[in-house]
Amino acid sequence: MFLLSLAARFVWIAAGQHNFNFVDLRVYYEAAQRVADGTLYDFALTDYTPQQPLPFTYPPFAALCFYPLKFLPFPVVAVAWVLLTAGLLFLVVRMSLAILAAGRGAPSRLGDVPVEHALFWTAGALWIDPVRTNLDYGQINVVLMALGVWAAYLIARTEAGPPALVLRPQRVDGASGALIGIAAGIKLTPAVGGLFLLSRGRPWAAVFSGLTFGATVGFSYLLLPSETRRYFTVLLGDTGPIGDPAKPDNQSLRGAISRFAGHDVGTGAAWMVGLAVAALLLFAAWWVVRRGDALIALVLVQLLGLLGSPISWIHHWVWIVPLLIWVVHGPLGRLGDHRFSGAGAGYTPWSTALAGTFVVVGLVGVHYTDDVLGWLGLSDGPVWALFMAQGLGAAIGLIALILAQRRRLQAVV
């Protein structure tokens, strides 16, 4: 089933509206060509999106990571990128299930997770809107998610105690912190993972993540001093080259509020109040599950980052995959026992209903919903804005489930 789904994705990418152009991957590829000539932040790709030029907006460390791509022809890079994304998605699914197993004291090595479960999830996840757009555009978000989930997996197995350990406890802080720091060095926003480390009582891991991020900046400055200075003193925080925050593609809190308001609200009072409310609700949800598995803690932290960021494009929301896994296989889930085949200790039908809603909305996605609403004459206004707030809706749904079922959760975690 997984191979059939992956083959269908290749056909979709080649024959669909994006016609195998991988616009974001082409930006990475072009950045790799320009690493050494001092023009890393002076180009913008226009061949495939003339209406919206695409510059390279990541830190210089990301360009250094992409540098090996310059030695390969682009078609090879494109095919390899799809295979890498699918493979890492499978790894994310498997690690997520292992984290849940560790949280309830079951065997939690990757080999203890049934392969058929992980393949089934991966086959379906390839068609969820955020993953689908990552594959269409050649985006890097699944790679970054894999680094974050890997860090959580190391911590979860340490929390489970012997014989689950894969590293000595004193080395887990360094390894998990380094993974978060490397991800932040590539794209900045994964730095929110430091809050996850703190939420699991790992202050030294958070310190290591900061030190690792600093090392990526220092390494970049050593090799690309002018580009590094320019990025961190001039370009950082400038969302202009990235796009309009009010576009439906932007699923951050700022994007959702802006669509209801009919204009970009920026970082003014409406955004600050909304962010404060979102942070408070996410903290309340975390407080309920703070003694539970590491997966839900990681998901809640990532939701804070996605909602709080000025721009969170659809393809940034790949965290919907571990979110769905927790809803289905967590303590409230229909398949939440230690074998991932029976009801969890706190099972509630509401988790099944929520998972089904997430799947349907995720498979349809923002763009197709927007097309249908446009056909119905609802291309703006509050109804349109409501249906476009799918990321915010996912966060609200998860928070509501946790808070409504807090007694069940507190009894089993």
Mark where each language-model region is:
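Primarily membrane-embedded glycan-assembly and transfer machineries that use lipid-linked glycans
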Residues: 1-174, 203-317, 329-332, 377-386, ...
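Hydrophobic alpha-helical segments
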Residues: 1-4, 193, 398
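Hydrophobic transmembrane alpha-helices
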Residues: 73, 88, 187-190, 323
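Hydrophobic transmembrane alpha-helices of multi-pass, membrane-embedded glycosylation machinery
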Residues: 151, 180-185, 192-201, 213-214, ...
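Small-residue packing motifs within transmembrane alpha-helices
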Residues: 173, 177-179, 216, 270, ...
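Membrane-interface alpha helices of multi-pass inner-membrane proteins
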Residues: 173-197, 301-308
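Membrane-interfacial entry segments at the cytosolic side of transmembrane helices
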Residues: 199-211, 341-354
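Aromatic-enriched
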Residues: 328-332, 342-413
